[in-house]
């Protein structure tokens, strides 16, 4: 049986990291062009035991991506699937260990190469260690990816019953936590928490003012925190990081962000 850490890590990759492929295929011009007019079904799966598997699948219709957690059970054939023999093997692959290659089930080689182009682009983007210089477009894309990854990752850990995260969520009234870059509403993500339940969302939370918002003055400042190259206290003093809400909640959310990051590294 897989360890709790293995299960948590796999869920973050399956339900928080791999769904970023939709954003990358949509926001990176050369990839968006590659999928113009394309219809395809893709899947990534990992065996849990002899009968069960974890999976995420992607349905591309005329170039537009949708992401679905779980196995594809439709009538069409999957064009390409990366099928891992275990969650451990998938986790190693996602962390860059090329010794844990999946079984590749390919119906259409052309569509497979397009899918791999997006997966490789995601890998290269999430491997960037320093904020890009003089490239705001790339910096904003990276912020969006990390905001989506972290909000979804924390929510998924809660849903799995991670002791630290779920205990916090159980005690929480109806609250919304948000990540944002000032002046760029398209680069925003949130997580709503209430009595043990949670839901991550993309874009600004519209129903009410967020209970807490971790806002950055620009994408570069955000990346300094997200990539661990900036000093949080100094940046807060310089108003590069603005915590809209009680600072103790910022520390709490920061701990869960680091938890997601540690599992995914």
Residue ranges of predicted features:
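Feature captures hydrophobic
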Residues: 1-265
């Amino acid at each position: 049986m897989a360890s709790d850490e293995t299960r948590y890590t796999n869920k973050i990759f399956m339900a928080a990291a791999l769904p970023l492929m939709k954003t990358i295929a949509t926001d990176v011009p050369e990839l968006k062009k590659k999928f113009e007019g394309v219809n395809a079904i893709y899947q990534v799966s990992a065996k849990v035991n002899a009968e069960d598997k974890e999976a995420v699948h992607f349905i591309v219709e005329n170039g537009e991506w949708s992401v679905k957690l779980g196995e594809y059970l439709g009538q069409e054939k999957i064009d390409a699937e990366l099928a891992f023999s275990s969650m451990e093997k998938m986790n190693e692959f996602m962390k860059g260990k090329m010794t844990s290659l999946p079984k590749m089930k390919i119906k259409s080689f052309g569509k497979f190469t397009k899918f791999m182009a997006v997966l490789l682009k995601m890998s290269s983007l999430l491997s960037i260690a320093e904020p890009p210089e003089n490239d705001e477009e790339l910096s904003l894309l990276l912020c969006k990816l990390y905001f989506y990854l972290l909000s979804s990752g924390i929510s998924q850990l809660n849903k799995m019953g991670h002791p630290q995260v779920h205990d916090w969520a159980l005690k929480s009234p109806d609250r919304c936590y948000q990540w944002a870059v000032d002046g760029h509403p398209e680069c925003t993500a949130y997580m709503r928490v209430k009595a043990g339940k949670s839901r991550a969302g993309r874009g600004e939370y519209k129903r009410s003012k967020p209970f807490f918002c971790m806002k950055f003055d620009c994408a570069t400042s955000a990346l300094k925190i997200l990539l661990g190259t900036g000093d949080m206290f100094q940046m807060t003093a310089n108003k590069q990081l603005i915590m809209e809400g009680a600072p103790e909640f910022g520390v709490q959310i920061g701990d869960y962000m680091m938890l997601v990051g540690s599992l995914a590294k």
